[in-house]
């Protein structure tokens, strides 16, 4: 355990930041799951709405250093591609 007061404070701050980061990370995952659920049931309108909300939350996570920019871009790209393929399949 930390002996100096500054080290004790740093330990407290680390615990606090860890909880906040876990909460934000969990929220991002939840929004992604909502998009995946809408894609799985084939509802393209709701999937697009859910994607726009999820995209906003993902980019907020990038801004807060929860996830990296390339990871966020990859997730958004893959979800968008799935929604786009949904539209093509439903029009045939």
Curated annotation (Swiss-Prot):
One Pfam family here: Ribosomal_S20p
Biological process according to GO: translation
Domain of life: Bacteria
Role, per record: Binds directly to 16S ribosomal RNA.
Name listed for the protein in its UniProt record: Small ribosomal subunit protein bS20
SUPFAM superfamilies: Ribosomal protein S20
Record keywords: Ribonucleoprotein, Ribosomal protein, RNA-binding, rRNA-binding
Primary gene name: rpsT
HAMAP family associated with the record: Ribosomal_bS20
Record InterPro entries: Ribosomal_bS20, Ribosomal_bS20_sf
GO cellular component, one term: small ribosomal subunit
NCBIfam families: S20
Organism: Rickettsia conorii (strain ATCC VR-613 / Malish 7)
